[in-house]
Amino acid sequence: MKNTVCTALMLLMSVCMYAQELYGEYEKKVYVSSQGDSLKYRLLRPEAEKAGKKYPLVLFLHGAGERGDDNQKQLVHGGQMWLNPVNREEYPAFVLAPP
């Protein structure tokens, strides 16, 4: 029983670490208004960002399956699409993902 619990915990920890690596390129940010209200969001910058060049802003609005307030669930399905190296090269953009 003890070995089963240890194995399950190790598996869970490895999955959590993989998720952090997967979305690591998305910067964790927090907007704070002048009234003190805050909004967490994730920002993905263009891979080869050049100073002075303009890039489009993609506002990634997720569905109900990705709702939450942990600032990571919103990336579960569509967030991977923007990390694809081909997409990042072909469509350089800022990707903003609120929770």
Regions picked out by a protein language model, each given a short descriptive name:
Residues 57, 61-99:
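Active-site machinery of serine-nucleophile hydrolases
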Residues 1-22:
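Bacterial Sec-dependent N-terminal signal peptides
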Residues 13, 51-53, 97:
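Intrinsic low-complexity, intrinsically disordered segments enriched in polar/basic residues
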Residues 7-9, 51, 81:
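N-terminal hydrophobic alpha-helix used for membrane targeting or insertion
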Residues 17-57:
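A domain-start/cap signature at the N-terminus of enzymes
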Residues 6, 48, 66:
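Residue-level marker of positions within ordered structural domains that often coincide
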